[in-house]
Amino acid sequence: DEQHFLTQNGRRKNNGPFQFGSLEGSYEIDSLNLLTVGANLFHGKMTNRSEYTVNMQDINRNPVYDYNRNSDATETFGSTDVSVDYQHSTHKKDELLTISYRFSHSPNDNKDYTELKNVVNYNPWLGYPQNNINKASTNEHTGQVDYTTPTWKDQTLEVGAKYIFRQSRSNTDRTAFNDSLNIWEDITSKDSHFRHTQHIYSAYLGYSMKFDKFGVKAGVCKND
């Protein structure tokens, strides 16, 4: 194959602010019942702007093609988490029932615009300018129940169960400008839309014993 020389020069500018926040509050219904609510928020946005000059030369350093490529890209991401916990104690020492719920939303969206200018002897296989938009996120619901109770002296029984319902999605849409027809065309691939759902179940059983200065704990866990 004939040797060629590719030169690419340009500049890029990035910017990415972030925001964080959290809040938690509790309400003591009475001496045996406690309700706790919490929330956490994280949000970020990255922007990227680039300008490049691309030049191809043959083995004799004669120009083959030239063009300028400019791109603007934005990524938005983060998470929102909300939790609710209910704790119920009894008059029996160290006996405790906890019921918990968690919700989490994690978006991750991207979009970019790319154009070619000052094109000389270059024919890309797809039209330009191009728009690419991806919208993705994961939603997760988690419910959990935990129960702890003493049995005999220095012995404790623990049981619990958890259920997670998780939904993930990702949709990508692409358009390119057809210069000959003067229209935007959809060039989205058939496998660019994604959906996935998960149901996760788990349960555990534990038993602990203390003997003077020593302790023993055994347990089993089942996940599905």
Outline where the language-model segments fall:
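Primarily recognizes Gram-negative and organellar outer-membrane beta-barrels
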Residues: D1-D224
